């Protein structure tokens, strides 16, 4: 668990899905934490950006939902990893571990409609 958290904190690049629609191209906006003022944008159909004015355009009405889903899945990935680490530390049986994972999975499925509101 400590190794996983260390790798997560040590990873210096954040990729944010900026915009995705069937009618338009998809783009990833990359921010490097090691190099100050380093920004790059990678698109499915690359085009030249002369200024950083395009950075304002990636906020649309779905951005809050994207952040909610990202945080939700981040929290539940920690919960799944914690469940497996707990099972290993306590020497639980495989049946008990699977029951815990099933309960977490059911909780994830039941909380999906709440995220869409």
UniProtKB/Swiss-Prot annotation:
Signal peptide: none annotated. It comes from the Viruses. GO terms for cellular component: host cell membrane; membrane. It is found in: Host membrane. Its main location: host cell. Keywords: Glycoprotein, Host membrane, Membrane, Transmembrane, Transmembrane helix. Glycans are attached at residue 62. The chain crosses the membrane at residues 3-23, 69-89, 94-114. This is Protein MGF 110-11L.
């Amino acid at each position: 668990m400590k190794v996983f958290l260390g790798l997560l904190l040590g990873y210096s690049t954040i990729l944010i899905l900026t915009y995705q629609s069937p009618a338009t191209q998809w783009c990833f906006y990359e921010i490097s934490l090691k190099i100050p003022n380093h920004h790059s944008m990678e698109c499915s159909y690359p085009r030249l950006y002369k200024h950083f004015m395009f950075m304002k355009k990636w906020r649309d009405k779905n951005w809050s939902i994207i952040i909610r889903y990202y945080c939700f899945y981040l929290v539940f990935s920690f919960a799944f990893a914690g469940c497996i680490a707990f099972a290993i530390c306590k020497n639980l049986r495989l049946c008990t571990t699977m029951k815990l994972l099933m309960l977490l999975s059911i909780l994830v499925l039941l909380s999906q409609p709440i995220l869409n509101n």
